[in-house]
Amino acid sequence: MPSTADERQLLDELRDLLAATVEDLTVEEIGPDSSLQDDLGVDSLARLELVAAIEDRWQIEVPQEQADRLTTVRQIAAHLAEAVAAPAGGTA
């Protein structure tokens, strides 16, 4: 469960972004612990599109090897919370 209002907001924004990015997916279908591949049917192309949308929306860079390890919506939201809180030039 997200521990702060900011994390909850990130989770909600991420769910909206996922629904907008992945064809035939609605916000209602996306739970915090949904697996991108197993539960939501996100294939490799959709994952690339999602990562690009995340990078554009939050102005961060998500290295491919890191993106590959983020398999649930909650994991992505946690990574985003760390990345947007990190000072410019810091590691996330």
Swiss-Prot record:
One of its GO terms (cellular component) is membrane. It is found in: Cytoplasm. SUPFAM superfamilies: ACP-like. It comes from the Bacteria. The keyword Cytoplasm applies. InterPro entries: ACP (IPR003231), ACP-like_sf (IPR036736), PP-bd_ACP (IPR009081). Its main location: cytoplasm. Keywords: Cytoplasm, Fatty acid biosynthesis, Fatty acid metabolism, Lipid biosynthesis, Lipid metabolism, Phosphopantetheine, Phosphoprotein. Pathway: Lipid metabolism; fatty acid biosynthesis. One of its GO terms (biological process) is lipid A biosynthetic process. The modification O-(pantetheine 4'-phosphoryl)serine is found at S44. GO terms for molecular function: acyl binding; acyl carrier activity. Belongs to the acyl carrier protein (ACP) family. Carrier of the growing fatty acid chain in fatty acid biosynthesis. This is Acyl carrier protein. It comes from Streptomyces coelicolor (strain ATCC BAA-471 / A3(2) / M145).
